[in-house]
């Protein structure tokens, strides 16, 4: 099969996991996009806002690895459906926030519900796409995180400004229901023939990883012994941490430091997300075509993140944000398409969820 020619089943799977991961980010980032308005309405300080952002990641860190393990044990279809229901329910409850503790608790719960999503989706991609298709598939899949930034910043600040922040959360909570129905009918394990083909395509090192092991302890030991996976976890800790630090704080930074409105900051972040949306599938497709190793290409694009961030931080003219913002979006997100493709490539076929959960724990 040509690496850029996907079957109908592959397209449906990719669309389903793309929308699932997209909505996990829309719900995650809905807080950041309305934070300037919500903080003022509930008299939260900037420090309290930071703690609410951190609450999500505390919950996320608790379930990202167990969620991957669960996806390998009970199937990624079940973990995806459960996460969609949980995220929708918690986001709806966020419209009832009245104080700091309630906000912290709900943000924590949202993180718990979001933890299994990425590992489950990557596991599905690993099952349905061959090694020469995964760069493109993962690049397209990871573009949803950038589109999530664009989407939430297009509507949430506007809805919060004109109809109240509570309405913004309720509107966000409705979105996963349609995707839940789609995933219920489309997300399935591939046929035994396809699964046998994927096993045969796995690299020798990955094929040996954990074969015959049923113990969780032994499976984790095998993952930890894989140098590629350890390096990806360390790289992800620094690169992904910086990416989401920038994304979570950019709206508030522009409002408080540069004096723009919440709607204006949302427009800048929409352009930021759109640029990243284009960059990720592009670099993923190129990684499948160019005679360059994915790890070398990943190192190059990670290096470019630094200058892009310095350029954005040096921007004092609000109009220039529409130029430096997209540049930062490209620099901040391009690496994720490559690193996640490398995760799928490095993992044993039956441990893809666990491996993705382990790497994304960092």
Predicted regions and their residues:
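Helix-to-loop junctions at the C-terminal end of transmembrane segments
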Residues: 64-75, 280-292
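Cytoplasmic helix-loop-helix junction between adjacent transmembrane helices
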Residues: 106-147
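Extracytoplasmic gate region of multi-pass secondary transporters
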Residues: 31-32, 226-270, 277-280
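C-terminal transmembrane helical hairpin of 12-TM major facilitator-type secondary transporters
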Residues: 293-342
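Helix-loop-helix hairpin linking two adjacent transmembrane segments in secondary transporters
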Residues: 141-192
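Juxtamembrane intracellular "pre-TM" segments in multi-pass secondary transporters
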Residues: 1-7, 193-232
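Conserved MFS/SLC helix-loop-helix module at the cytosolic interface between two early adjacent transmembrane helices
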Residues: 62-101
């Amino acid at each position: 099969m040509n690496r850029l020619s996907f079957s109908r089943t592959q397209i449906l799977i990719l669309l389903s996991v793309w929308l699932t991961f997209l909505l996990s980010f829309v719900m995650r980032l809905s807080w950041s996009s309305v934070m300037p308005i919500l903080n003022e309405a509930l008299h939260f300080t900037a420090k309290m806002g930071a703690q609410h952002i951190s609450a999500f990641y505390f919950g996320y860190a608790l379930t990202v690895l167990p969620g991957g393990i669960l996806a390998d044990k009970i199937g990624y279809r079940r973990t995806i459906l459960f996460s969609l229901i949980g995220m929708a329910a918690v986001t709806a409850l966020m419209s009832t926030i009245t104080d700091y503790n309630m906000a912290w608790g709900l943000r924590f719960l949202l993180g718990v519900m979001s933890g299994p999503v990425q590992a489950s989706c990557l596991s599905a991609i690993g099952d349905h796409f061959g090694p020469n298709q995964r760069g493109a598939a993962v690049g397209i899949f990871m573009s949803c995180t950038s589109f999530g930034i664009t989407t939430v910043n297009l509507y949430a600040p506007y809805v919060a400004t004109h109809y109240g922040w509570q309405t913004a959360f309720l509107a966000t909570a409705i979105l996963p229901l349609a995707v839940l129905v789609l995933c219920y009918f489309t997300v399935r394990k591939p046929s035994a023939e396809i699964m046998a083909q994927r096993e045969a395509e796995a690299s020798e090192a990955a094929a040996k990883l954990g074969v015959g092991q049923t113990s969780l302890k032994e499976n984790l030991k095998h993952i930890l012994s894989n140098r590629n996976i350890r390096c990806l976890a360390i790289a992800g800790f620094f690169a992904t941490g910086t990416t989401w630090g920038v994304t979570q704080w950019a709206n508030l930074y522009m409002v408080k430091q540069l004096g723009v409105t919440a709607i204006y900051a949302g427009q800048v972040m929409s352009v930021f997300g759109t640029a990243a949306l284009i960059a990720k599938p592009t670099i993923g497709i190129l990684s499948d075509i160019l005679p360059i190793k994915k790890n070398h290409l990943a190192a190059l694009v990670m290096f470019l993140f630094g200058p892009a961030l310095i350029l954005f931080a040096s921007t004092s003219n609000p109009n220039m944000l529409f130029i430096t913002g997209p540049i930062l979006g490209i620099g901040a997100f391009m690496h994720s398409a490559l690193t996640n493709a490398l995760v799928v490539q490095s993992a044993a076929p039956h441990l893809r969820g666990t491996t993705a959960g382990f790497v994304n724990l960092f």
